[in-house]
Amino acid sequence: VRQMFIDAGLAEDDVVLDRAVPGYYRRSKEWDVVATYKGQLVGVVEMKSQESSPGNNANNRIEEAVGSSVDAQAVQDLTGAYGDLGVWAAWCMTFNRDVDTSDAVLYKRNRLPLFKVDDEFIPMTYASQYAIAIQRFISRGVYNAGWMLTTWVNPDKTIGYEEPVPTATAETLRTQIEARVRFALQALP
């Protein structure tokens, strides 16, 4: 993902890994990729993976993703900390299909929701929960772009993969990054 920003026209020194930027609801947030140009934010990218125990982490990862985006937008709206270009954020998820049994995730005994659940979540696997989340992140503008990659190990030990969300593929992410970098280069001559 870092290389996508560089290939789009940013200098290598302008695209850093694992760096913090200011937050509003918290002091700062460390993003996996932070791209800048002339001291202004071009984009931030969060990269997550789920290799085991999805039941322990799926909801937390989705909640964290929403919070990170809301926090970044709030600090920009209220302080302008990131410069004149506004916030551009992407969320990427690699999910190991081998940990997902493809069985529907059931509610714990006596823990049914009090209100009707969105039909799209019925039935739900952890992989489908991530796919729904990232598709909605993009369509609702929570994130500008994303990438979901589902992986598995084939019987011959090679790695297989698919990109289950048409709006969140490597190619759509690259297209979004290229457009954002072009915008930054034009807006900040």
Predicted regions and their residues:
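Acidic-basic catalytic patches of nuclease active cores, encompassing PD-(D/E)XK
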Residues: 1-18
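A generic structural signal for well-ordered alpha-helical segments enriched in polar/charged residues
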Residues: 3, 7, 71-74, 183
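Charged, often glycine-rich, active-site loop that binds/positions anionic groups
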Residues: 18-33
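An acidic- and aromatic-residue-enriched active-site/binding cleft used to recognize and process polar
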Residues: 20, 47-52, 94-96
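Active-site beta-strand-loop-beta-strand hairpin of nuclease catalytic cores
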Residues: 27, 34-44
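Glycine-rich, often proline-containing surface loops adjacent to acidic residues and nearby aromatics
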Residues: 40-51, 90
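Acidic, metal/cofactor-coordinating or nucleic-acid-engaging core segments within structured domains
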Residues: 55-155, 166
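A cross-taxonomic marker for long C-terminal extensions/tails that follow the last structured domain
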Residues: 150-189
